[in-house]
Structure formats: structure tokens, C-alpha cells
Amino acid sequence: MSDQKKEEEEEAAAAMATEGGKTSEPENNNKKPKTSGSQDSHPSPLALLAATCSKIGTPGENQATGQQQIIIDPSQGLVQLQNQPQQLELVTTQLAGNAWQLVASTPPASKENNVSQPASSSSSSSSSNNGSSSPTKTKSGNPSTPNQFQVIQVQNPSGSVQYQVIPQLQTVEGQQIQINPTSSSSLQDLQGQIQLISAGNNQAILTAANRTASGNILAQNLANQTVPVQIRPGVSIPLQLQTLPGTQAQVVTTLPINIGGVTLALPVINNVTAGGGTGQVGQPTTTTDSGTSNGNQLVSTPTTSTAPASTMPESPSSSTTCTTTASTTLTSSDTLVSSADTGQYASTSASSSERTIEEPQTPAATESEAQSSSQLQSNGIQNAQDQSNSLQQVQIVGQPILQQIQIQQPQQQIIQAIPPQSFQLQSGQTIQTIQQQPLQNVQLQAVNPTQVLIRAPTLTPSGQISWQTVQVQNIQSLSNLQVQNAGLSQQLTITPVSSSGGTTLAQIAPVAVAGAPITLNTAQLASVPNLQTVSVANLGAAGVQVQGVPVTITSVAGQQQGQDGVKVQQATIAPVTVAVGGIANATIGAVSPDQLTQVHLQQGQQTSDAEVQPGKRLRRVACSCPNCREGEGRGSSEPGKKKQHVCHIEGCGKVYGKTSHLRAHLRWHTGERPFICNWMFCGKRFTRSDELQRHRRTHTGEKRFECPECSKRFMRSDHLSKHVKTHQNKKGGGTALAIVTSGELDSSVTEVLGSPRIVTVAAISQDSNPATPNVSTNMEEF
């Protein structure tokens, strides 16, 4: 039995030696393994120990010395490092969206057994003296090895290049895990915090901090949204707080202004400089966070580089409270981070030595403490409180600080002078506040052109009332309000003046009007007894609208219709007098444009047929006009005598045998055109109905006048008459004179038409060939 046991032990030792030789074969390639067949002696204890150690082996020889795991949660703004700590540097680049721009710089790995660890992808940035950066990207290593980062290059709209690093993790089973930056549901339990540490040379190192640490952390705001951080060489970090929870709408403060008995609400923006005294209001260039208690908000941007950190004291007896929140201006070497939910400020100086300033702020204060807010707090920052909202709204930028003034009720502003105050920070920086004086001169300017309604109604011919508007150009001060006329209608005031003859004259100051009508209503003229003369300045292209007063003005370019059917038309032949409604007669003398136009109002008799309503057919009625007289053509003793209707316009004196012809003639004087062409896209207006019928035939192409000799048809009767005379001249021979007018040759139309006409005189001479007479034509105006 003993010999058999010894043989078994020898075989086991030989087998172990064989395995040990195979294991050490990669280390010693020149050596051959030993077998137990060549040895008869017993193995020594040292050989057994070496075989046992070689059998066990080292499990981590062929693997990397360490594996780096980085957990990134961009939606929460967190980075957590596991296993070996690794430095992460923020590259000089511009942020895009909610992604963190991270670059991993791995330390050199140790080399054992001729196995080199592949380096991870890295990206670096070299900063020059002028602050410009030139990012470079290097990538090496086997893609299947762990501890690798995926670098994504993003092109910005501004032209710069961004690099986004996404780590690829490997599980125990060897599966690759790639983190999705948009989803954070699986990483909610691994919430870490970020700490900014100054490393000198305008660089900031982003490392993982303890979860229980409370200083120098960049926390979330009240809305649980990401806080974008951007690091630039030589420039401070701008921190912008996100929108606060709640649906407060931003309302611009309106300032009530009384203009002519009408209260207007003009949107204004108040701008108070740091030095006090005078301020100029304009459109702000920076935005502010909404969320005030009432929505009334005044935005003020200081013009100095350092804004005073002060607080407007509240007045319990006043209905208006102004609260100002200000801070210091960050220099190029200061870094400021804010935590809105904890109310803490942390300032880190970017120098070789790390300096941390923590300034906790009291979240709430009583009303008595707000009244005595001139005293400094222990932390060096004063409280800015509101009676209805204790939440402080701060926006910190790397430029002049934006001040925010909250007004509870826009009734009266009470601004008190603040004595000079100073406070000292822990880092040794001293800020001196500037004494503010009460506002003395405030210049207001409307943000947008404001339409101001002035109670000056104008009645249109259709019966509608239109309101004239005046645009406020500038407002210098509340006591001195200047309103510039925008070329709209002006109101004229008539003042009675006693003349040498004992009559009362109503004079109107000359007013230069460009393209706008002047309105004269009955109320202005009725207050003046025995009104006879009204002087109106040069009108240019404007007209005069008369309410209840019959006035017709000549030497006025264009046409204008009054409220009582009175028309204004340019007339260059003679002065015109019109009687409408039996109120008065108006005589207007045609003068040069630089002179005044005299309007003479005379008492007259009522005329029933002076007004003509468009669209109605006129019927023949007995004329009761006092200007009409009995006819003298057949003698006064004849029973069948005719009345003659005389035009009462001064300087005209035309006589007509029919009242319809006189009415048509008066419409020509007043400029009325009641007959409108209803053809598609035409709409021309005419004074007489026969003119409308003649015009309508131009659309239809109707030729109703036919020559009895040659059956040639014409559109107008005067063309037919001219054609008939050519036949008569051919038959008669010799020299004949043909006079053809531009209107129709019937007697009724000739009597109605009182305007000048162009007359064609054709002299026809007979030559040797009677078939081809010579015709010489000349044009004369009568």
C-alpha cells in the first residue's frame, strides 16, 4: 500500500509540473517543459509550491489595470465618477442645448507583460494670450476595449465647432453600454453634484463632489431645469436663472395722461441712472424674468460700470413701493454661481489659490425690518422684500447689473434718498454705493407710436360719424406736453370782431392745412350774431366741410362734399353763389392761392329744389324760384307765355326754359355727379343723365343713329349731323361752312350745358375736281 501511494504522489507531482511548464511557456519561450517521466526521484516541496502558485495564476494580468466609469446625466446637470477618480476639464467651447461639453484626460496606464493599455479618445484646447482657442481632437485605441469615449463633433450656426464626449461602459458580461444624453430615467438614483475648482491659467476643473457638501455647488433652480454654464478664458461665467414656476404675465406700466379731457394710458419704461437726477427712458436691451406680484414692472439699466447694491425702503403710508435688487459687476477673474432654491451665492476667484465666498441670504423679513433696511446685514447683502411676495428674483450677467423695480399700485412713486453705504466682502473687495437723489426731471418717450382719440367727429355723406386721430410724436414732460400735428383735420374757432361799419365779423386765424378738410359746424357760427364774413387761409389741396352752412369755395384743387349735399369744385370763370336750405347765400371770390378767400354770408330765401338726391328720378314740378321771371319772347299780354329760369349764381346769369335744365346746370356749378355708370370696373359719375347714356353706349357698342342716305350708323347724334352735312356740301358745291360742336345739337342739351365747349370750324373750298374738296380745319374755344 505504501508503494502504491508513493507512485500516485509522483504521478500527481509530474502532472502539476507539466501544467506549470505550460503556464510559464509564454514567459520563457526558449525553455522546454519538464515531464515526470524523466525523473525517478521525489519532487521537492519547493517544486510543489511553485507548481501550486503557477496553477493559481494572476487573474488580472491580461486585463487593463483599471476601468474608468463615468455617469453623465445632462437633464439633471450631474456627473458622477466611479472607481478611479479622473480629471475632467471644461473645454473652451460654446454650449448647445442641455449637453455638457466634457473632455476626459486619462493618466498613462502601467505596462505589464508587454500588454499596453489603449488610450481613450481625448480632446484638448490650447488657449493663447488673446483668449482664442484652437480645439484639437485625437483618437486612438481599439474600439472594442473598455474605458473609451465617443467624441461627437457639432457645428454651431455661428461657425464654431463643439465636441461632445459620450462614454461607453462595459458590464461584467462584456456588453457595451452607451449612455443616451436625452434619457435620465435609469440614472435617477445616481445623482451627483458638480464642483468648480480654480486651476489657474483661466481653466476650471469639473470634479465630483460629496453629496453632502453644501458649498460651491451648482444646484438646480425652482423649476428643476438645467443651469447652463459656459467658461471662457479671461471672461467671467454668466449665470442665467430659468423661469420661475407660475403664470405671471408681464405687464408694462402705463402712465395716465390727460389730453383735452381724455385720459390716456401710455406705456412707458422708466430708466433711473445710478447717480440720480435725470434719466432718459428708452427700450431696454436686456430681458428680465417675469413674475412680479402685480405684473407692473419698471426695468432700469444703470449706465455706470458698477451698480450700487441698495434697497428702496418701504413706506407703509404710501400706496407704491419700489424695490431694487442690484449686485456688483463681475470682473474677468471672478466666477459667480447661484442656487435659487437655497438662496445662496458663491463666488470663486479664478486664481492660483482657491477662495470661496459664501453669502447666505435671509429668505424672508418682516415689514418693520424692511423699513429699517438701511442697516447692513452681516453677510454684506441687503434684503429686497415685497409685501405680497418674499421670493427674490435675480438675474446676474457679466456686464452692468440689471435692476428690477417692482411697483404694487401704479398711482404714485415715492423714491427716497439713500445715504452712502459700504460693505466689505470676505475676499477684501469693497463696494461704495452712490447716493441717489429724488427724481426731478423725467423725460418720457412712448415705446410705440400711440394713437390718441380726440373728440372731433366728422359726419360723412352716408351718415356715419368718423373720429379724427392725432399721433403723439414726443412728450417732453408731464407739465409741458407737445403734440405735433400729423396733417389731420384742425378745428377752427370763430371770434366776433367789431368793424367800423357796425357789423360783426367772424375772423378765423389763417391756418396752413395740407390735404385735410376744415370743418365749420353750425354751433360755431350760431354763437356769433350777424355773421357776414369768414376769412379762411390758403387751403391748398384741402376742402371745406360745412355743417348746416351753405358755403361753396372756388380756387380749390379737387372736389369735396359737404354735410348738406353742398359740393366744392374748382371754378376759374367767375365767383359762385349757392343757396342751400334757405340758411344763407355764400359768395366766394376767386383769388390767388397766397391770398385769403372771402366768404360772404347773406340772408336768403329757402329754395325747395336746390338739393338733389342721387339715384332718384326727377319729376317736373312748378317752379317757385323768385329768380325766375316771366318770358318776354312772345309779349306780356299773351296767355301762353313761358317762364324763364335764370341761374342765380353771380356772374353766370344763364336762362333756361325748364326747371330740370336749371337743376342740371346748378349741379354743374356745385360739382354734384349723381349719375353713376354701373358697368363692371367702371364707376364713372356724370352730372346729367344724357351724359351717362352716351357713356354707356361706349361699353355696349350700340350705334343708334343711322344716316338716311348711305345707311351708315353712328354712336352719337352730333357725329351723324356732321356726316349728313358732308352729303349736303357735295350736292350744293361751292364753299360752305360747317360748325360742329362737341355736344349733342338738340336744344335741350345746348341749354343745359353751360360749360365752355370746343367748336370745330371747317372751311370747305371747291376746286377743279368737285368730288374731292379741300377741307381746312381750325379749332377755336368759345
From Swiss-Prot:
Keyword Phosphoprotein: yes
Region (Disordered): 1-48, 107-148, 275-385
Subcellular location: Nucleus
MF-aspect GO terms: DNA binding; zinc ion binding
Composition skew (Low complexity), residue ranges: 120-146, 281-342, 364-378
GO biological process, one term: regulation of heart contraction
InterPro entries, sorted: Sp4-like (IPR039938), Znf_C2H2_sf (IPR036236), Znf_C2H2_type (IPR013087)
SUPFAM superfamilies hit by this protein: beta-beta-alpha zinc fingers (SSF57667)
Predominant location: nucleus
ZnF C2H2-type: positions: 645-669, 675-699, 705-727
Pfam family, one: zf-C2H2
Modified residues (Phosphoserine): 44
Compositionally biased residues, Polar residues: 107-119, 344-354
Domain of life: Eukaryota
Keyword Ribonucleoprotein: no
Listed GO CC annotations: nucleus
Keywords: Activator, DNA-binding, Metal-binding, Nucleus, Phosphoprotein, Repeat, Transcription, Transcription regulation, Zinc, Zinc-finger
Span(s) of short sequence motif 9aaTAD: 465-473
Gene3D superfamilies according to UniProt: Classic Zinc Finger (3.30.160.60)
Expression sites (tissue/organ): Expressed in many tissues.
Free-text comment about domains: The 9aaTAD motif is a transactivation domain present in a large number of yeast and animal transcription factors. In SP4, the motif is inactive.
Stated family: Belongs to the Sp1 C2H2-type zinc-finger protein family.
Functional note: Binds to GT and GC boxes promoters elements. Probable transcriptional activator. Required for normal male reproductive behavior.
Annotated protein name in UniProt: Transcription factor Sp4
Lineage: Eukaryota, Metazoa, Chordata, Craniata, Vertebrata
